[in-house]
Regions:
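Positively charged, low-complexity/disordered segments
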Residues: 1-9
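Extended alpha-helical targeting/anchoring segments
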Residues: 8, 13-407
Length: 407
């Protein structure tokens, strides 16, 4: 577990959740009016496997991706582009753990940093490389098609005997990294714009993503979760697209699965909300993306301040839409059936602001670039009447947007 602080890194292995909670809770101060809420923030990811520090989940899956379970950044210098206000903010933070002996000198240093930052931004150019389109991308999975089909059938047996109602099974796709990770992110912004777009450039790997789904959000003292469950591919024509939309909304299997996960989302929000404040503000609406469409609902509740921000995040972690129901047993089955630890996939990505708010999304439609490899993981929700072949195809369709960003 890695925590980055003002130019240094700290590896945490012993009960990391306690230290992370303390770091987040201690990171509080009033942001000056007129500045964005993210003018001072802690940002990064919590891998799916973070839950192993919280719950007693089996540890059979091998860790072959070799990235930290949690990686958080507390940036000192930020450039924030506010698309709504059409403004760019240049910000330098001073943290209370910095030892300052000469404040006038520090002030002049910050002014110099801001001046350099402004000058650099004026000189900045788009350095996207014009690489040739690949005629074919060779993709392999850590799970064969037959193995995935047998995983689905095994999960259905667990459902039949009453262990679970639903479980999300996934496979990890791997291909050669043929572009600079930042160029992939730039293309993804064009080809698959999503509510959450992110690019993290760590020293030894990069995370690139376009997630459609909130994990947990705290804003204006409101807790929000937004479950997404139920999928169809996008049509090649408007007529076909409309057909898929209608077909999705009348599919009893998809509707019952979504209702179950909506109830789970209400329960998660209720854990950290004031009594009798949780309500569904949107239910069973269709949201469309570049390669797939989904059924989406929205749940909000009044934040109960007796819970810390980190515990509020954990109330919905991992999301039921990427684990299953009941969560603990579903995660045990995931560990039994899947070949590798999920790591970044199905975890949480986002930020905690110094003003007490936070916003996180589920690490879906998310890739990890490491050395010369490009990894994309995708899953499908398995219920009693799941058709194994269709569930396999759903994972392939979900991964396409990221894979195609390499073209």
């Amino acid at each position: 577990i890695v925590q980055s602080l003002v130019g240094s890194e700290m590896c945490i292995r012993d009960r990391p959740q306690i230290l992370i909670e303390n770091i987040i809770e201690d990171f509080k101060f009033k942001i000056p009016s007129g500045l964005p809420s993210i003018a001072s923030l802690i940002s990064g990811y919590f891998s799916y496997d973070t839950i192993r520090y919280i719950e007693n989940i089996p540890n059979k899956c091998k860790d072959d991706l070799k990235v930290p379970d949690v990686r958080l950044l507390r940036p000192r210098i930020l450039v924030i582009h506010d698309n709504l206000k059409k403004k760019i903010f240049y910000i330098v933070n001073i943290f209370k753990d910095e030892k300052i002996s000469n404040y006038p000198k520090k002030y002049l240093g910050i002014k110099s940093d801001l001046s350099k930052l402004f000058t650099q931004s004026l000189k900045a150019k788009d350095k996207t490389t014009n690489e040739k389109k690949l005629a074919k991308i060779n993709v392999k999975s850590n799970t064969s098609k037959n193995k995935f089909l047998s995983m689905v059938n095994k999960a259905k047996k667990y459902i039949k005997i009453g262990d679970i109602f639903q479980v999300v099974l996934s496979q990890r796709f791997e291909t050669k990294l043929t572009k600079k990770p930042l160029d992939i992110y730039k293309k993804l912004r064009i080809t698959n714009p999503s509510p959450f777009m992110f690019f993290f450039n760590f020293n030894d790997f990069q995370i690139i993503g376009a997630s459609p789904e909130i994990l947990v959000r705290l804003r204006d003292n409101k807790i929000t979760v937004r479950p997404i469950a139920g999928t169809r591919p996008r049509g090649k024509t408007m007529t076909q697209d409309k057909f898929y939309e209608k077909d999705l909304l009348k599919d009893k299997k998809e509707l019952s699965e979504h209702l179950m996960l909506l109830d789970l989302g209400r329960n998660d929000a209720g854990k950290v909300s004031k009594v009798n404040t949780v309500k569904v503000t949107e239910s069973f609406v269709i949201e469309k993306y570049s390669h797939v469409m989904h059924i989406v609902s929205n749940v909000i509740g009044d934040y109960n301040k007796k819970f810390s921000k980190f515990k509020s995040l954990l109330a919905g972690f991992p999301a039921g839409t990427v684990s299953g129901a009941p969560k603990i047993r579903a995660m045990e089955i995931i560990d039994e059936l899947e070949k590798s630890r999920r790591k970044v996939y199905a975890g949480g990505i986002g930020y905690f602001s110094a003003n007490g708010e936070f916003d996180t999304c589920i690490a879906l439609r998310t890739a990890v670039a490491k050395k010369d490899k490009f990894y994309v993981q995708a899953g499908a929700g398995i219920v009693a009447d799941s058709v194994p072949k269709k569930e396999y195809e759903e994972t392939v369709n979900k991964a396409k947007a990221l894979i195609n960003a390499l073209r």
